[in-house]
Amino acid sequence: MVYPVRNKDDLDQQLILAEDKLVVIDFYADWCGPCKIIAPKLDELAHEYSDRVVVLKVNVDENEDITVEYNVNSMPTFVFIKGGNVLELFVGCNSDKLAKLMEKHAGVYTDEAADVKAVHIDGECIVDLTAESSESDNDNNNVNEVSAHDENAVLEH
């Protein structure tokens, strides 16, 4: 089951109730396309690991204080917490990586899960909350996007 967090006090209470279980916080927005893409997989994983994992959803538009506290700049962002400690962060909508991280931190450890790094950003599948809408700002902060599959790509400035 995925639990929608209402506010900071609610989040704090859910973290206490989780005790020694893994907590996965999904930072999302209703208007975020990548968030909608990964939501069904998150629901599936929450059901599959319900005995070991608590999945919480935090709407960034309704809970700015929590979003700032966890330094969330893009969506979807998944924060993995156990025993009150942040273990790992994953940004993007790659459902395979999300599943591997759940396996890794929920105690279902595989060699494949061991290859997962501490911070993951799937740049093809995020919404950047820090992006400026002004064209002049975008010109000053020229960001070049390259497909993760294009090994021969060259960035031009």
Swiss-Prot record:
UniProt tissue specificity: Testis specific. Not expressed in the embryo. Becomes progressively more strongly expressed during larval and pupal development. In testis, it is strongly expressed in young spermatocytes, and postmeiotic spermatid stages, then expression decreases at the nuclear elongation stage. Strongly expressed in the waste bag, in which material no longer needed for the mature sperm is eliminated. Not expressed in the stem cells and spermatogonial cells.
Cystine crosslinks: C32-C35
Localization per Swiss-Prot or TrEMBL: Nucleus; Chromosome
SUPFAM superfamilies: Thioredoxin-like (SSF52833)
Sequence similarity: Belongs to the thioredoxin family.
Broad class of where this protein is predominantly found: nucleus
Comment field (misc): The TrxT gene, which encodes an testis specific thioredoxin, is adjacent to the dhd gene and shares some regulatory region with it.
This protein's UniProt keywords: Chromosome, Disulfide bond, Electron transport, Nucleus, Redox-active center, Transport
GO process annotations (BP): protein folding
InterPro entries referenced in this protein's UniProt entry, alphabetically: Thioredoxin, Thioredoxin-like_sf, Thioredoxin_CS, Thioredoxin_domain
PROSITE patterns: THIOREDOXIN_1 (PS00194), THIOREDOXIN_2 (PS51352)
Annotated Basic and acidic residues bias: 147-157
Role according to the record: Probably participates in various redox reactions through the reversible oxidation of its active center dithiol to a disulfide and catalyzes dithiol-disulfide exchange reactions. Its tissue specificity suggests a regulatory role in the germline.
Molecular function terms, GO-annotated: protein-disulfide reductase activity
UniProt domain Thioredoxin: residue ranges: 2-107
UniProt protein name: Thioredoxin-T
